[in-house]
From Swiss-Prot:
One cellular-component annotation, GO: extracellular exosome
TPR repeat start-end pairs: 28-61, 62-95, 96-129, 142-175, 177-209, 210-243, 256-289, 294-327, 328-361
GO biological process: chaperone cofactor-dependent protein refolding; protein folding; regulation of cellular response to heat
Function, in words: Acts as a co-chaperone regulating the molecular chaperones HSP70 and HSP90 in folding of steroid receptors, such as the glucocorticoid receptor and the progesterone receptor. Proposed to act as a recycling chaperone by facilitating the return of chaperone substrates to early stages of chaperoning if further folding is required. In vitro, induces ATP-independent dissociation of HSP90 but not of HSP70 from the chaperone-substrate complexes. Recruits NR1I3 to the cytoplasm.
Entry-annotated residues carrying Phosphoserine: 393
UniProt protein name: DnaJ homolog subfamily C member 7
Gene Ontology MF terms: ATPase activator activity; heat shock protein binding
Length: 494
């Protein structure tokens, strides 16, 4: 708000005038004094009324217009104030305060160059005027902020633009252009509530402001409320048919909505290849639309998971959470892909993030399941040791044991180096452990459920794999390995 401006006193006329003129001037002076009194009490509306009465009585008095301009400035009505200030200096070009008020109005409205001209004229009339000197510096500062902001906007350094506009608005509080630029940059930074607030304030004063309508639409567009956004873009284009930014945004919004809907339709119909292509095309429309693009990445990740391209699905979900780190659905999708690829630590991390954000029973159970799989993954994988899947039958487990036990039996590697013998002995023991657990339904159930087998009284530390081997192949002395045949050994039952 502009600083309170001083009111001017009209000197009595020195030359005799007609009685009617003198009475009019006396009455006008009375109205002016009443206006001054209300101004001093900060009742600017009443002050405005009395200054207007004074002007009606004496429309050629420059100071009356100057006083009313000062009052309008205090009411924040800078455009009207500018008209009065300009009229005051038209009537009296030597009226320093008139030039100061004209410059102050120009500056408040964001026209810093015009403000400089007014302040320069005031300094020509009174070169020692401290207010004119300071206001001239302020106007030049605003021009510098404008220049920096223009360059930084081209560089997409939106934070710097917001900073410059905040500084400029300290001197130009009524400049819609600065406010709109700030609001647009706030929207580009994802600070939508702040941007909406600035645009809404302007629209309350001017409901036809195309720039403000565009910014309102831009915020909705970036918040993925595309239908509502299009309505604002269309309204902005009605107000200003040549509004280039609104035109581009409207076109992008419609294209993005159509591609996304087509992709969703293809996905529901099970046409995953087409859905992938459509989501990919949608992602190329507007890289600035972070929220919508996060959803598109997540959708494409879901498609990739359906196509069993799990690494690609993980990458898409990662891109989604990079754009929107609060996007729960993307974390859940990525966590499931991590589970499917046995990356349990990563899955636990994602489920922990989800559960910290939304503490539901479902999310808690997903986290517990991932933690269990992580615990199980750190034990020996007996299925992998035998080379069977988790649904292997009893016969398949026996066949696998026979094959692996013979493959790793120490006698078969008696001629190998000490290092190889040690490694094969270790593998032979693990094969026996695996068979002991997986061939026993109760032990297998406990193993599959992730229970600590040692705590269940099945400590494998003293386990002797030879006992299993002998029992499996028919007792002691019932087998031997010799260097013979293509396999360099032969097996013989007793």
């Amino acid at each position: 708000m502009a600083a309170a401006a001083e009111c001017d006193v009209v000197m009595a006329a020195t030359e005799p005038e007609l009685l009617d003129d003198q009475e009019a001037k006396r009455e006008a002076e009375t109205f002016k004094e009443q206006g001054n009194a209300y101004y001093a009490k900060k009742d600017y509306n009443e002050a405005y009324n009395y200054y207007t009465k004074a002007i009606d009585m004496c429309p050629k008095n420059a100071s009356y217009y100057g006083n009313r301009a000062a009052t309008l400035m205090m009411l924040g009505r800078f455009r009207e104030a500018l008209g009065d200030a300009q009229q005051s200096v038209r009537l009296d070009d030597s009226f320093v305060r008139g030039h100061l008020r004209e410059g102050k109005c120009h500056l408040s409205l964001g026209n810093a160059m015009a403000a400089c001209r007014s302040f320069q004229r005031a300094l020509e009339l009174d070169h020692k005027n401290a207010q004119a000197q300071q206001e001239f510096k302020n106007a030049n500062a605003v021009m510098e902020y404008e220049k920096i902001a223009e360059t930084d906007f081209e560089k997409r350094d939106f934070r710097k633009v917001v900073f410059c506009m905040d500084r400029a608005l300290e001197f130009a509080p009524a400049c819609h252009r600065f406010k709109i630029l700030k609001a647009e940059c706030l929207a580009m930074l994802g600070r939508y509530p702040e941007a909406q607030s600035v645009a809404s304030d302007i629209l309350r004063m001017d409901s036809t402001n195309a720039d403000a309508l565009y910014v309102r639409g831009l915020c909705l567009y970036y918040e993925d409320c595309i239908e509502k956004a299009v309505q604002f873009f269309v309204q902005a284009l009605r107000m200003a048919p040549d509004h280039e930014k609104a035109c581009i945004a409207c076109r992008n919004a419609k294209a993005l909505k159509a591609k996304k809907e087509d992709g969703n339709k293809a996905f529901k119909e099970g046409n995953y290849k087409l859905a992938y292509e459509l989501y990919t095309e949608a992602l190329g429309i507007d890289p600035n639309n972070i929220k919508t693009n996060a959803k598109l990445y997540c959708n494409r990740g879901t498609v990739n998971s359906k196509l069993r391209k799990l690494d690609d699905a993980i990458e898409d979900c990662t891109n989604a959470v990079k754009l929107d780190d609060t996007y729960i659905k993307a974390y859940l999708r990525r966590a499931q892909c991590y589970m499917d690829t046995e990356q349990y630590e990563e899955a636990v991390r994602d489920y922990e993030k989800v559960y910290q954000t939304e503490k539901t029973k479902e999310h808690k159970q997903l986290l517990k399941n991932a933690q269990l799989e992580l615990k199980k993954s750190k034990r020996k994988d007996y299925y992998k040791i035998l080379g069977v899947d988790k649904n292997a039958s009893e016969d398949e487990i026996k066949k696998a044991y026979r094959k692996r036990a013979l493959m790793h039996h120490p006698d078969r590697h008696s001629g190998a180096s000490a290092e190889v013998q040690k490694e094969e002995e270790k593998k032979f023991k693990e094969v026996g452990e695996a068979f002991t657990i997986l061939s026993d339904p109760k032990k297998k159930t406990r193993y599959d459920s992730g229970q600590d087998l040692d705590e269940e009284g099945m400590n494998m530390g003293d386990f002797d794999p030879n006992n299993i081997f002998k029992a499996f192949f028919g007792g002691p002395g019932g087998f031997s390995f010799e260097a013979s045949g293509p396999g360099n050994f032969f097996f013989q039952f007793g």
